[in-house]
Amino acid sequence: MSEAALPPRVQRFLETHIDSIEKLEVLLLLRNQPARIWTAAAVAQELRIMEASAQGRVEDLCARGLVACEGGAPPPYRFAPAASEDSQAVTELAATYASRRVSVISFIFSRPTDRLRSFANAFRLKKD
C-alpha cells in the first residue's frame, strides 16, 4: 500500500505531530487507556523503551496539546487532546495504524529523508 492509502486527516496529523514510530506508540498507548494517569517510567516499562526517551516523547506530546501534563514529581500524564479535531484525528490514526500499519510506518519514515535531502541540497554548489 502507498501513502495515498492513508486518509488525508491522518496524513496531516502525522506531518504535524508525529516524527517517529516511538512517539506514535506512546500516543496510542495513552489513548488506549485515557482514564489512566501515566508516568514516563510506566510508559517506558509498558513499551520497553528507555525512560529518558519516554520522558522526551510525553513532554513533546504535552507541548503539542495532545497529552495533559499535571504537576507533580514525577509528572503524571494522560491522553487529553486540547482540540476535538486532534482527538478525532488520533482515533482515525489508531484505526488506520491497526489496519494499515506498514503504510503508516512508511509514511513516517519517508518524511525525514525528504527533509534531509532538501537540507543537503541547500549546500550544493551551483554553476552561475
Regions found by a protein language model. Give the residues of each.
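Pre-recognition alpha-helix immediately N-terminal to the DNA-recognition helix
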Residues: 24-29, 103
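Short alpha-helical segments that sit at the start of domains
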Residues: 1-25
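Exposed, interaction-prone assembly regions rather than primary DNA-binding/catalytic cores
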Residues: 99-128
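Short amphipathic alpha-helical interaction segments
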Residues: 48-63
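Short, cationic-aromatic polyanion-contact patches
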Residues: 17-20, 71-93
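A short, conserved structural fragment
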Residues: 62-74
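Short helix-capping/hinge SLiMs at alpha-helix to coil transitions
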Residues: 16-20, 31-36
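A short acidic, leucine-rich amphipathic alpha-helix
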Residues: 26, 39-46
